[in-house]
Amino acid sequence: EALKSIDLKVVLLFGGSLALAKALETTGAGSIIADAIVGALGANPNPMVLLVVIFVVGCALTNFMSNTATTALMVPIATSLAESLGADPRSMIIATVIACSCAYATPIGMPANTMVVGLGGYKFKDYVKAGLPLIAVSFVVCIVLLPILFPFYG
């Protein structure tokens, strides 16, 4: 009975997401993505803008792939972004970890969410309604506190 309760789609989604994150890390695609983000924001972008971008991208991705895989993908990108500015990477990394833990708005991003969809009879929009306010609170707290707790420079 325990084996029957395991949803193979959840296992495959999680495994595939981890494989994707590892491939992006191994190929150096994380650095390429970081360079593209910095390039799109212009020369010497404000670290606060990068913090917002990292949070938004991490949060968006984590709601459509495993939060563990998203974190594995985004941490090297966040680190590369901070290093490209000569900034302390701690704020960027912590924002990434928090954003990648905000898998509240879909049933996909976290295995626990996926497991209870059928049990609770939830619809996709139920996750969006409950998850977006939680994400908004996390965003505000991160953007306000992290630069204070871990200044970008000095």
Spans of model-derived segments:
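Non-catalytic, surface-exposed connector residues within folded enzymatic/regulatory domains
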Residues: 14, 68, 72, 92, ...
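Flexible hinge motifs at transmembrane-helix junctions and intramembrane kinks/re-entrant loops
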Residues: 1-6, 88-89, 152
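Hydrophobic alpha-helical transmembrane segments
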Residues: 12, 48-53, 93-94, 128-136
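Membrane-embedded alpha-helical segments and adjacent helix-loop junctions characteristic
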Residues: 3-85
